[in-house]
């Protein structure tokens, strides 16, 4: 009989009341420094608010997240000596996790002053269907499309 509790999930952040923002903060966080990660994310949101007049930062953030999250991905499966790349549908939780990971990865690589500015620029580009994170999503979709022939190999 297990004594583990039920996973409570993430709490909504205090500024926007949104769980997705908390997940982004957790993704940005390194070495357990959550307050630093929160400061970076909120600063990026403030930059977005200043740059975009017609929409608030949370709308831009949600649009960016939707544009980066992949619908399908390829997974490797070994069938008789050959390894096939099989296109699979992505679960919603993994979609969001991949989107956050890619946004962080490409924001870090960007040129700019600080991480907050880089993150704001990447989110704005993603919301406008541009930027490296959206290209990554398109690349993953192209890979899945190219390997449609192996879709009958299911896990």
UniProtKB/Swiss-Prot annotation:
InterPro entries with a match to the protein in the record: Ribosomal_uS7 (IPR000235), Ribosomal_uS7_bac/org-type (IPR005717), Ribosomal_uS7_dom (IPR023798), Ribosomal_uS7_dom_sf (IPR036823)
Keywords associated with the record: Ribonucleoprotein, Ribosomal protein, RNA-binding, rRNA-binding, tRNA-binding
Gene Ontology biological-process annotations: translation
A GO cellular-component term linked to this record: small ribosomal subunit
Subunit composition and interactions: Part of the 30S ribosomal subunit. Contacts proteins S9 and S11.
Family: Belongs to the universal ribosomal protein uS7 family.
Protein's UniProt name: Small ribosomal subunit protein uS7
Organism name: Prosthecochloris aestuarii (strain DSM 271 / SK 413)
């Amino acid at each position: 009989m297990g004594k583990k509790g039920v996973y409570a999930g993430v709490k909504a952040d205090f500024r926007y009341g949104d769980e997705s923002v908390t997940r982004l903060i957790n993704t940005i966080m390194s070495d357990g420094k959550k307050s630093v990660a929160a400061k970076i994310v909120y600063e990026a949101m403030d930059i977005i608010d200043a740059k975009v007049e017609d929409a608030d930062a949370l709308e831009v953030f949600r649009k960016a997240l939707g544009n980066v999250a992949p619908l399908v991905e390829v997974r490797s499966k070994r069938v008789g000596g050959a390894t096939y790349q099989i296109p699979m549908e992505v679960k919603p939780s993994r979609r969001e996790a991949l989107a956050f990971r890619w946004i962080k990865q490409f924001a870090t690589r960007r040129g700019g002053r600080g991480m907050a500015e880089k993150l704001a620029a990447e989110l704005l580009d993603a919301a406008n269907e541009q930027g490296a994170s959206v290209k990554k999503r398109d690349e993953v979709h192209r890979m899945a499309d190219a390997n449609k022939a192996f879709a009958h190999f299911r896990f």
